[in-house]
From Swiss-Prot:
Record: residues binding ATP: 50-53, 89
The protein's name: Pyruvate kinase
Residues engaged in binding K(+): 50, 52, 82-83
Lineage of origin: Eukaryota, Discoba, Euglenozoa, Kinetoplastea, Metakinetoplastina
Keyword vocabulary terms for this entry: ATP-binding, Glycolysis, Kinase, Magnesium, Metal-binding, Nucleotide-binding, Potassium, Pyruvate, Transferase
Pathway entry: Carbohydrate degradation; glycolysis; pyruvate from D-glyceraldehyde 3-phosphate: step 5/5
Reactions catalysed according to its record: pyruvate + ATP = phosphoenolpyruvate + ADP + H(+)
Organism: Leishmania braziliensis
GO terms, molecular function: ATP binding; kinase activity; magnesium ion binding; potassium ion binding; pyruvate kinase activity
Matching InterPro entries: Pyr_Knase, Pyrv/PenolPyrv_kinase-like_dom, Pyrv_kinase-like_dom_sf, Pyrv_Knase_brl
Assigned EC number: 2.7.1.40
Cofactors required: Mg(2+); K(+)
Length: 91
């Protein structure tokens, strides 16, 4: 589809369709369900968590909140896990 053909199909009355990926790193200030819903409404499609910081419980709460926010808005959100540096991981 040409750029002109694409532009002709756009409508101000339809929700914005993103063609890119917006990755947001989730931290303490964006961990709540309401904050996550705001990020999703703003275009977030991937929630990134930095495993270098935080406990297992903190990360589980974040995952649960991302899933709940996505379910309430009826969208799919990917979860990216950024693990610690160049270590050898087993199991």
């Amino acid at each position: 589809m040409s750029q002109l053909a694409h532009n002709l199909t756009l409508s101000i009355f339809e929700p914005l369709r993103t063609t890119g990926t917006i990755v947001c790193t989730i931290g303490p200030s964006t961990q709540s369900v309401e904050a996550l819903k705001g990020l999703i409404k703003s275009g977030m499609s991937v929630a990134r968590m930095n495993f270098s910081h935080g406990s297992h419980e903190y990360h589980q709460t974040t995952i649960n909140n991302v899933r709940q926010a996505a379910a309430e808005l009826g969208v799919n959100i990917a979860i990216a896990l950024d693990t610690k540096g160049p270590e050898i991981r087993t199991g």
